[in-house]
Structures are given as C-alpha cells and as structure tokens.
C-alpha cells in the first residue's frame, strides 16, 4: 500500500504541460545551413544496426536531427516500474535522479530518456513526460503523474560544425515512434554523434549499444550511449577504435595506453589536449522482482563493471550515469542471488558497450591524384558557411586550393591560424593530411561537404 509520504512525494512531481507537436515519419526535407532550430524535422528509427529482442514490456523510440547530427533515445515501459540510479563522473546532467535516490518501494518510472545536446538536451526528458500526459497515459491526478527520468551527453565541440540540439519536438517524435523489441546499435538515437578516446587523442566515432540475454525466466537488457573520455576495449583488452599516433601498433591494446601514465609509453606517444566533456549514460533492465535496496546495488555493481570495457572510466571529464529498472514480472528463481544477477547483467552490459562501436570513417589515401583544371579550382574557391560559428574560406593560388577557417573556431583539420593546402583525392574531392579524417567534397554545386558520410557537415557558398 502506498504511504502518505510517497503520496506527497508524487504530488511534488507535477510539471507544466506543453502542446504536442505534429510528427512526420517521412524523411526530412533538405535544408540549407545555417539551420534554424525551428525548421528542423525529426527523422525517426533510422541508422545503426538493428538488434531484435523479445520483451513486450519495453518499447524503444529513436529520433535525430540529421543536420546536427544529434539525437534522442526513449525507452518506455508498459506500466510504471521500479527504478534506481548510480551517478559517477565529474559532470553529470540528469532529470529526476534525486527522486529515485529516495528509495520509495513504489513502481513510478514510466520512461528513461537519453539525449544529446549537453544540458540543453535535458528538455528531452521533460518533453517525454508531457507526452505521457498529452496521450492520456498519465493525468494531472496526484497518483497518476508521469515520471520520466534521464540523462544527457555532450555532443558539441570539434566533432561537428554547428550547435543544433535535441528539443521537445525531437524527443516527442522519438516517444511516439517507440516500438517493441527493436534497438539500433551504433550511430543512432542519442548515440548519433558520440566519440570515445579523447583521453588518448583517439577521437573515435562511437554510438549507442544494446544487448539482451535470457536465463530461464529471467530477462536482462542493457542499453548504453558511449561518449567516453576513455577507450572501448574487448574482453582481451584490445582497443576497438582509435585514430592512433605515428608509430602506434595496428592492434592497439589497453595496456599500451594505460601503462606509465601520464608519460607516453613510447617515443612520440604524446597525449594531445582536447575537449574534456564526455559521458556514458546507461540502463540495465531486469524482469525479476527486486526491492529498492537490491535494485540500487544492481545499478552500482553493473556500473562498476563498466570500467572493464571503457578505460579509464568515470573521470573528472565524464558525467557517467547508470539507471536500473525492475519490471517485476517474475519472482527470483531458486538459487539466483543478487550478486549472481549482477554478474550476468555486467556481462550483458559489456556486450552493449562493444555493440556501440560503429564502422570508423577511413583516412583518405591518395594513390593517384586526379588532375584538376584551373577552371574547376576557381569554381571551388569561395566563402562557405556551416553555421553561425563556423565558416571556411577556400582560395585558389598557383593552380592549388587552400582553406582556412574564418569563423569562431576551426573546421576539423582546417585551422584559423594558417591556410591548409587541399590535396586532390578524387574528382571534386580533396583532403587535408593528418591524424584524423578531413575530406572536402565540392561535387554539389554551391555547397561544401566535409567528411561525407553519416557524420557529414554541409556548408553553403556565400
């Protein structure tokens, strides 16, 4: 029976309501930068690799603004469920985690939301809450208030050339697109534009990962958005993705990076400076009945285990958060202890971490440089605007092309301090040599596309 204390706590959760926007399942129309946040159209349940699993209690929706790119992942449950949270790292961004730490033995969580956009993306969590109200699942009555919890990751900075963020429109698109038994691993949802390995200068593409396991009647699902300061490693200690420095081994191991810190292990293995705002946000779901204390320990145990798959983990530059949910559909099996359940769940979470790693953009290799006419070179020259903060000036000189950033900050390998020579790579496509990919595609008239592909950034010629 619900206590008076828990009833009063529910009353304190009432929020102001907003209008639900019209949604579209069709691809977003082509917009020209600089993009207006108001004009962006959500694209739902796309990207990544599909993972199917059998658990009717869970519905998952994902939405993105491809122009960012940035996105949201919404996990909603068939009824209110019991939740717990474990917050680590030096810079978390959360909604309603304090309430979960009150340990009320009452199932109250409707949804867990993960979002890009740093603290601006916290709007996604409250947007899901109002969507619960707007669709009639929840109401304004004191014992039927919706409760969405969630966290954000930092996906701004040098990984993209704009500051588009997930908003109410995007989050509610993900909410209404939620479907049973489907999760997308890799560059999708809140993991649409994540990175790993800034700690070592790896700057690798990352994403979101999911995994599922059933042991008898017990179901365990793990979901994580990996935007870690550290690197992702498999069970043998092999680093899964890294743009290595000169002289680094091809099969890079965690021990190669972690030993002898802070000094580099080998000559030339310096650790470059970089942004120190990273976060891994995760969710472990079990169908076993648990009380609040047991669920809290599950969150702590699984969260602690993640330091095996991400190294280093929970640093001052991370804002790591772990949610744990019990759907309470089955009793505890005979012989299954809480530490055993935590051990199994920890392995499922490691699988989810590994599933988050997408195929990496390859570094361009010039084998036979194409001939570029003087006419084409002059046509490519001009001022290109990616956003209000990033522009690039392309100039022609002596039959060659050069580029220099003219906005507030650099554009990948193109800096504000000096012109970079653009090396012909393919017809209409050029590159800037360096540790990380910097590819410039001029094949679309009046536009410049940098690093073409799923993380591409587009500018228009002024």
Question: Residues of each region from the PLM?
Answer:
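Bacterial N-terminal signal peptides that target proteins for export
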Residues: 2-11
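Histidine- and/or cysteine-centered catalytic micro-motif in compact active-site loops
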Residues: 5-6, 225-229, 286-289, 387-389, ...
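A generic structural signal for short, solvent-exposed coil/turn residues
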Residues: 7, 16, 44, 66, ...
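Bacterial N-terminal signal peptides
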Residues: 11-19
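Boundary at the C-terminal end of the N-terminal hydrophobic targeting segment
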Residues: 22-24
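A structural signal for small-residue-enriched, beta-sheet-centric alpha/beta enzyme cores
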Residues: 26-119, 123, 134-365
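Short Gly/Thr/Asp-enriched flexible loops that form oxyanion-binding sites at enzyme active sites
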Residues: 124-129
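Peripheral terminal and inter-domain segments
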Residues: 366-462
